[in-house]
């Protein structure tokens, strides 16, 4: 998680967003680089689509035989009509804003693919103007 924080130092400064991490000491038996990609994509979006002086919270912990990854932001939120489509390849909620923020439109599709491949689940909670919380549950392979 420290590596991801360092990776986004410039982006955090550019958007004037603060990153808070709470990572429990857990052992995940699975593909670590996939998990790093998943977290990185979620954190990147949470920073880019946040409000100025916003916050991103990352909490990683274990519950029963699962690893839980929760990324929550104080950003712009996602309209209800778009929430069912944000994990589709190339889908963008606001195409004009997305051009300004950059990216390929693949980040959340990659997240969904990694989660599905690892037989996990994704839960989205978002309110327009209040932010978004994405919770990933991944079974700990043994």
Model-identified regions with their sequence ranges:
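Acidic ATP/Mg2+-coordinating residue in the GHKL
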Residues: 73
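Short helix-loop "hinge" at the ATP-lid/N-box region of the Bergerat-fold HATPase_c
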Residues: 46-47
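Conserved glycine-rich
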Residues: 119-120
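Short beta-strand/loop element within the Bergerat-fold HATPase_c
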Residues: 53-65
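Short conserved segment of the HATPase_c
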Residues: 78-92, 112
